[in-house]
């Protein structure tokens, strides 16, 4: 059984014909929980609980508590358009295994791992995923009356490493790769 609750706050300023800029920002606070391991068909069994109803309600894999998306578009002289989109997330949780008591029945446990946060523009360790994309566009009118646009896109402008597939297995002997992609 799964539950998902969220609230989104959003502010937008449209760019109209007489304005030189527009943009928006949206913040989403979400909470995803599960009873039983519904996203992991093969490794989701936990011998401590006889039925799904016996399992506790826990944070679900795929849960991301905080997400911020901001965008802006700017009209510059000579009809040059600049735009940006920023996506910041607290990190998407994944299934993980705790094998510190062993790997056999009634020994290995499952838990939910949250990727580590990293600093972003001096804000501190808040966001695990960080993406800033930029675009420049110059519209042109051809001699035959058709329109053409020259576009330059820069994806992940700050070259942030947005990893997935973390090593999340806890072992009896310390795992030197724990928490690494």
What are these model-predicted stretches?
Residues 31, 78-113, 125-133, 137-181:
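C-terminal beta-signal and adjacent terminal beta-strands/loops
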Residues 60, 123-124:
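Short, surface-exposed alpha-helical recognition segments that flank or form part
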């Amino acid at each position: 059984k799964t539950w998902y609750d969220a609230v989104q706050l959003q502010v937008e300023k449209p760019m109209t014909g007489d304005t030189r800029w527009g943009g928006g920002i949206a913040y989403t606070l979400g909470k995803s929980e599960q009873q039983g391991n519904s996203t992991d068909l093969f490794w989701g069994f936990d011998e401590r609980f006889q039925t799904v109803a016996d399992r506790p309600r826990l944070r679900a894999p795929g849960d991301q508590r905080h997400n911020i998306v901001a965008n802006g578009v700017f009209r510059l002289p000579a009809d040059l358009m600049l735009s940006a989109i920023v996506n910041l997330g607290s990190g998407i949780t994944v299934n993980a295994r705790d094998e510190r008591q062993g790997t056999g029945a009634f020994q290995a446990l499952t838990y939910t791992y949250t990727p580590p946060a990293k600093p972003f523009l001096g804000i501190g360790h808040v966001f695990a995923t960080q993406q800033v994309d930029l675009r420049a566009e110059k519209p042109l009118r051809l001699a035959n009356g058709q329109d053409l646009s020259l576009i330059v896109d820069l994806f992940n402008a700050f070259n942030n490493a947005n990893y997935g597939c973390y090593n999340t297995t806890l072992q009896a002997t310390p795992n030197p790769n724990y928490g690494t992609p």
